[in-house]
A protein has these predicted regions:
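An exposed acidic His-Trp-rich patch
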Residues: 59-150
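N-terminal domain-onset segments
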Residues: 1-50, 113-229
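Short, surface-exposed beta-edge/turn micro-motifs
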Residues: 50-52, 65
């Protein structure tokens, strides 16, 4: 019997060619943080275009599979009921602060991709809650993002910067200038039922521009993976 080629069945995995790195915090305990490698692929079209990501604790062949994340546009997020919105974290601060990096992209491609991510939202659960354990233990954790200065574990940031040869501080300066908005300062969620905010702690949740700029088109997709250099 002729057996089909193995790659015929690898479509879902082969689509996850977009890589970036960031930091996830447990929503119920924002001080618990994990450096998280995102391997993402696109699905859907138009308003319902989204990224599906598998998450690992490192880039090594033996990396631990931490969990999953779905990424949708601001338009999709705002269409969700409040009961659902509590699961979705903003990416705005992570982008402008340099918390998210895509080290295999060229500088130009990375700016384009981060501009796209700026107003998106992610829903992430870590099914391996504590990556220091030998096997996954306990219930899955709903994960969150840093949303203001002083929230990130700086030792994790320094270790990530050393690993990939990047500077979060320099990346922040470049992003703010290129994208044209001030870095937002939103406190951590008060509880697991708190609905996230992108730009402000209260009032109208809108950005403070540094200069005339425009937000990326909602729902616009990026299929980027250009090698740096």
């Amino acid at each position: 019997m002729n057996r089909p080629q193995a790659d015929k069945f690898m479509g879902p995995i082969g689509n996850h060619s977009l890589f970036f790195c960031g930091f996830h915090a447990a929503k119920q305990n924002p001080e618990f943080q994990v450096t998280t490698m995102h391997y993402c692929g696109m699905r859907g079209e138009g308003d319902y275009e989204m990224h599906q990501c598998v998450l690992y604790d490192s880039v090594s062949p033996g990396a631990k599979l931490l969990g999953i994340e779905y990424i949708v546009s601001d338009k999709v997020f705002r269409s969700l009921p409040d009961e659902e919105k509590k699961y979705w974290h903003p990416h705005t601060y992570e982008v402008l602060s340099g918390g998210l990096v895509a080290p295999v992209m060229s500088d130009e491609a990375e700016i384009d991709f981060m501009t796209y991510l700026l107003t998106t939202w992610g829903k992430s659960f870590h099914t391996w809650p504590d990556p220091t354990t030998a096997v996954p233990l306990g219930e899955p954790l709903l994960m969150w993002s840093q949303t203001g200065d002083g929230q990130a574990d700086m030792e994790l940031v320094r270790e990530r910067d050393r690993r990939f040869g990047v500077s979060t501080a320099e990346t922040r300066a470049v992003r703010v200038k290129a994208i044209g908005y001030q870095v937002p300062q939103v406190p951590p969620p008060r509880s697991v039922t708190t609905i996230g905010r992108q730009w402000t702690a209260k009032g109208e949740d809108t950005p403070a521009p540094l200069k005339k700029s425009r937000l990326p088109e909602l729902g616009r997709g990026q299929r980027l993976g250009t090698a740096r250099g």
